[in-house]
Amino acid sequence: MAFVRFMKTIAPRYPELVILGDLFDYWIGDDAHPEAQPVIALLKLHAATGRRVIVMPGNRDVMLGAAFARAAGAELIRDPIVADICGRKTLLAHGDQWCLRDVAYQKFRALTHDPRWQAMMLMKSVEERLAIAKQARAQSESEKGEKSMADMDVVESAVAEAVKAAGVDLVIHGHTHKPAAHMQNGYERWVIPDWELDGPDGTAKSGAITFLEGARPQIQMF
């Protein structure tokens, strides 16, 4: 698994680890994921060395909560947020809020981010929540074939507005899983890759964006 390899090889080189969502394929509540314990244990072990573990929920794991954070030794942050990255003000986001061409997705996103909807979901049994999550994932995968790549990508003008409002010249996001560095008019937009780009031969193919003091960010593929 690419994430495990990353945690054992690249992450220990840096004092902070920031995950911008979609660490898990789905998350139906902190009480319902025993299969996630190996990943949580890796994060906890990383945090125990004195390094910071910072997690922003994504669209797949929007319901990550306080119990997860305690178990993983992590800090949960809101989306979006301005952070100081090696002395540079940076806008961090999952990125799906800027995929405005996909109107149906934006309606679904608004629903899943509603605290009332989340509270209602948590009142259901684990089995009911799991069935709902699997149905949503299946529908999402089915609809991908009906949408163009442009429809599923960010709207650059929306990103530009967010960058201007935040007063930054650098934005880092995920969601689209199209790792690249975009040099726009007046700002840089860096896109992180998916964790699950493992090749058919089992070779982990993923990456991360890394920072060093005084240097430009870099996309490290591994």
Q: What annotation goes with each model-predicted range?
A:
Residues 1-85:
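Core catalytic region of metal-dependent phosphoesterases/phosphodiesterases
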Residues 5, 41, 45, 66, ...:
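Charged/polar, solvent-exposed surface patches and flexible loops
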Residues 8-12, 41-45, 79-82, 101-103, ...:
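Glycine-rich loops and low-complexity Gly/Arg-rich segments
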Residues 9-12, 44-52, 94, 125-129, ...:
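Short low-complexity stretches enriched in small and charged residues
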Residues 12-18, 47-51, 85-88, 120-127, ...:
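Short C-terminal domain-edge/linker segments immediately following a structured domain
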Residues 16-17, 38-39, 49-57, 130-135, ...:
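A broad, low-specificity signal for short, low-complexity segments enriched in glycine/proline
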Residues 71-78, 89-91, 96, 101-108, ...:
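Conserved beta-sheet core of the metallophosphoesterase superfamily
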Residues 95-155:
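Active-site-proximal loop/helix segment associated with metal-binding centers of metalloenzymes
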